[in-house]
Amino acid sequence: MEEKKEFKKDQKRKDNKKPFKKAPTKTLDEIIVETKAVVKVTKGGRQRRFQAVVLVGDKKGLVGLGTGKAAEVSEAVKKARQDANKNVVRIPIIDGRTIPHEVVGVKGATRVIIKPAKEGTGLIAGGAVRSVLEIAGYHDITSKSLGSRKKINVARATISALQSLKTAEQVAEARGKSVEEILG
């Protein structure tokens, strides 16, 4: 019998594969945005599979989006969850409730406009935009989605919009000014 060699943490494998990446230790909340049946037509007939779109986040500025396909819905959701955990990004939240400025996100034919709102306004958003903003941890935002309403593209446009946000500190640093000069 062959003995299995144990690898040290920083030791490279002989087959040049990357070492297994551990799942994040934080537990993230999850929202299933969409599950749908998809069909591939072949000469042997129709092959039916399921596609799932899942959002994960910690409601403190972390958010990730993933998709998965499988023969069963539960397997598709599991794959989508794993994909979402790989695609987690951090986005800024001002005062634990809103965004610093208006922003527009585009994905395909979808445009999403997101605007900050006064305290107590609540989330004025629909569909996938609302899901992304809730899982990210926002409380006071207004939004409008234009063009295509395809859920995955709306979610991707929302995340791209949130990733393009800049804090006052980042703007001040880019302009070579102090934060007080930027805020007026």
Indicate residue ranges for each PLM-predicted region.
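Ribosome-associated RNA-binding proteins
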Residues: 1-184
